[in-house]
């Protein structure tokens, strides 16, 4: 005689299983093409309700809906929960305007609100750093040499055969001219100069610029040199070669000197901010 079967006391469907059924029903309604999953009905042998009848997949264990293994199923369930979906709302759905369009006529400039004008006037000086003192460039620090205006220039020219007429420094360099006695038709005039105190030197030729006013009878030659170095001095002397002879004008042995600017032109700190126009 078989022992009497104990009365069935387990709950046929617990709360987690019911939640899983509700979730699956929701996604089936949203995606009808989702693969349907069949479930076995409770049998005589005490088969646990809710076990899936899906085909056996090698390497994949079967687990109950009410107890996900490893927490992975719980994360999947949470990610599929309809309560955690992100929603996008547009401004027009909330009664707001998507864009604000303002049209202005050419003859009617827009009105700037009073509070904007007050703010601009109050912050006008705070928005910009104080202007640095304007750098002294070559044109502003113009250094000119005009020996032709000095007394005794004609006597010096007669004695030296060559004299500096003028020389001035500009933003593009040094421009000058020299007078030489007209001793022969063929003559060569050049300028020897240095920007490092004669540690190195170069020589630039001068070009014929026409006859000079007399007396004495002389010709004028023009020349151009680089600008004096910043914070330094450009030294130069004149050289005249004619009929196999050579004459110099080196300012009585002191050389001619043109001073360079103390700071490079346009130097100074850049403006931290630019103008901002408000409409």
From Swiss-Prot:
InterPro entries xrefs: CBM21_dom, CBM21_dom_sf, PP1_regulatory_subunit_3
Chain spans, region Substrate-binding motif: 248-256
Sequence ranges assigned to domain CBM21 in this UniProt record: 154-259
Gene Ontology BP term (one): glycogen metabolic process
Domain remarks in the Swiss-Prot or TrEMBL record: The CBM21 domain is known to be involved in the localization to glycogen and is characteristic of some regulatory subunit of phosphatase complexes.
Record function comment: Acts as a glycogen-targeting subunit for PP1. PP1 is involved in glycogen metabolism and contributes to the activation of glycogen synthase leading to an increase in glycogen synthesis.
Keyword Phosphoprotein carried by entry: yes
Residues carrying Phosphoserine: 16, 33, 66
Stretches for region Disordered: 28-87
Motif (PP1-binding motif): 87-90
Transmembrane segments: none
Official protein name in the record: Protein phosphatase 1 regulatory subunit 3E
Biased composition, class Basic residues, residue ranges: 51-65
Region annotation Glycogen-binding motif: where it falls in the sequence: 176-198
Keywords, sorted A to Z: Carbohydrate metabolism, Glycogen metabolism, Phosphoprotein
């Amino acid at each position: 005689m078989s022992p009497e079967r104990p009365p069935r006391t387990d709950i046929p469907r617990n709360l987690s299983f019911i939640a899983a059924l509700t979730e699956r029903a929701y996604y089936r309604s949203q995606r009808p093409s989702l693969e349907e999953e069949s479930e076995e009905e409770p049998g005589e042998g005490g088969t646990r309700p809710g076990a899936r009848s899906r085909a056996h997949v090698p390497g994949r264990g079967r687990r109950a809906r009410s107890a996900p293994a490893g927490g992975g199923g719980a994360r999947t369930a949470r990610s599929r929960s309809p309560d955690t979906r992100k929603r996008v709302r547009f401004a027009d759905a909330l009664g707001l305007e998507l864009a604000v369009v303002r049209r202005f006529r050419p003859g009617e400039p827009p009105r700037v609100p009073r509070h904007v004008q007050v703010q601009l006037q109050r912050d006008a000086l705070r928005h910009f750093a104080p202007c640095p003192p304007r750098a002294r460039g070559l044109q502003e620090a113009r250094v000119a040499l005009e020996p032709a205006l000095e007394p005794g220039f004609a006597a010096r020219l007669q004695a030296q055969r060559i004299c500096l007429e003028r020389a001035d420094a500009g933003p593009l360099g040094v421009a000058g001219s020299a007078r030489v006695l007209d001793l022969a038709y063929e003559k060569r005039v050049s300028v020897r100069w240095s920007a490092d105190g004669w540690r190195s030197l170069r020589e630039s030729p001068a070009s014929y610029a026409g006859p000079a006013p007399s007396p004495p009878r002389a010709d004028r030659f023009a020349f151009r040199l680089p600008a004096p170095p910043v914070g330094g001095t450009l030294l130069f002397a004149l050289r005249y070669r004619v009929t196999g002879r050579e004459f110099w004008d080196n300012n009585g042995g002191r050389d001619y000197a043109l001073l360079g600017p103390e700071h490079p032109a346009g130097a100074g700190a850049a403006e931290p901010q630019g103008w901002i126009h408000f409409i």
